[in-house]
UniProtKB/Swiss-Prot annotation:
Gene name, Swiss-Prot/TrEMBL: FGA
Any single biological process term in GO: adaptive immune response
Compartments (UniProt record): Secreted
Complex and partners: Heterohexamer; disulfide linked. Contains 2 sets of 3 non-identical chains (alpha, beta and gamma). The 2 heterotrimers are in head to head conformation with the N-termini in a small central domain.
CC annotations in GO: extracellular region
The protein's name in its UniProt record: Fibrinogen alpha chain
Annotated function: Cleaved by the protease thrombin to yield monomers which, together with fibrinogen beta (FGB) and fibrinogen gamma (FGG), polymerize to form an insoluble fibrin matrix. Fibrin has a major function in hemostasis as one of the primary components of blood clots. In addition, functions during the early stages of wound repair to stabilize the lesion and guide cell migration during re-epithelialization. Was originally thought to be essential for platelet aggregation, based on in vitro studies using anticoagulated blood.
Length: 16
């Protein structure tokens, strides 16, 4: 999954 900012995050994580 990727954020709108284009950074990768794990599912159910949300770590930036």
């Amino acid at each position: 999954t990727k954020t709108e900012e284009g950074e990768f995050i794990s599912e159910g994580g949300g770590v930036r």
